[in-house]
Amino acid sequence: MAIMGSPKKKSSGPFQSLKNSFLRNKGQPPQLQPWNPQVRTDNTKRKSVQRTTLFRHDYVKVRSWPSDNPKNINVILSKTSFEIYEIDMGNSKERMNYLSLGKKDQFVHPILPKLKVGRVPSDQKQEFKIIISLFNPERFWEVTFLSINHGRVPRKVINDLEQVLSKICQYNNKDPDNASLKDTKNDTKAIPSPKIDILEEVDDLEYLLAENVPDQEQIPEAESLELNESSTISSISMEHSLVQSGDVVNKTFKQALGRIKPIDFNTRAESSRYKRFSSFHSAFLDVPRISAEYQHSLQDKRRSISVPTAIDYKSVSNHDMRKGVDFDKVSWMDVTFEDFPEI
């Protein structure tokens, strides 16, 4: 009995595929791929980002406050590290400077060329302070540099920091108080003092107060006394005339108000015969508490501002009828309050 064996499997490994490719391309010239220069330039541009420390100090104190409220001071970090470093992207145009606070970059802020940093004068010689003005939101950072041994900050540290800040931002190491005083002195010297010509102002009404008094040097003492007495008398008479003119104005004003008839709203609501022709109405005349003398003056001098639209002929006396009064042509301006005693 014959035993059937299993068929052999064809090897399909990587070497076999490579062998088959050589057999297919046997006798053909090799094909070279074209050279692409862009691929090489892309590879050359790929560089790792490098961080370079420009300045570092391990013992600083940082405080912050908003620009609108300088009294609201907050301590951000105390006894922490201060570092200024540069990030290089492989191109001179792609370099950025950053400010880092804390050992693990707890606070990081970019340093732009327009960033303003100023030195603050300190009372203590061992301290060195700078103020950094930040935006979005507007606030200030006060960085105090301290020495490790509680002594004076080394001069080398201050020089290195000032040299770095002067290159990457707007740094001012001058005392602001002295600088402002110098600026004000220079401004005062530069501005010339204006020459003001003082002229006497001519008043158009000055002739009313002027008195025709001759010079006292040419007048004897007796005549000067008489002139003084006459001037006092004239001033008293002038004051008296002013008082009299004020009384005349007040009296005329009272008479003008007296000609206005106070309107009684109750009687006008009961009768529909009356029509008000004047839009002016004084509220203070409607008060019922009016003195008897004032009411009598009103009846004598006031003029009616409201008349009946239809005149009641019964209220008119026979004497007026005999005079031949044409009531159809009578207007409200021609009728006085005395013509209608019933109102």
UniProtKB/Swiss-Prot annotation:
Signal sequence extent: none
InterPro entries registered for this protein in UniProt: Inp1
Compositional bias (Polar residues): 13-41
Location relative to the cell: Peroxisome membrane
Gene Ontology biological process terms from the UniProt entry: peroxisome inheritance
Swiss-Prot/TrEMBL keywords: Membrane, Peroxisome
Region (Disordered): 1-48
Location, primary (coarse class): membrane
One Pfam short name: Inp1
GO cellular component terms given for this protein: extrinsic component of intraperoxisomal membrane
Top-rank taxon, per record: Eukaryota
Bilayer topology term: Peripheral membrane protein
Keyword rRNA processing: no
KW Mitochondrion (keyword) present: no
Function, as annotated: Required for peroxisome inheritance.
Family per record: Belongs to the INP1 family.
Name of the featured protein: Inheritance of peroxisomes protein 1
Organism encoding this protein: Kluyveromyces lactis (strain ATCC 8585 / CBS 2359 / DSM 70799 / NBRC 1267 / NRRL Y-1140 / WM37)
Gene label: INP1
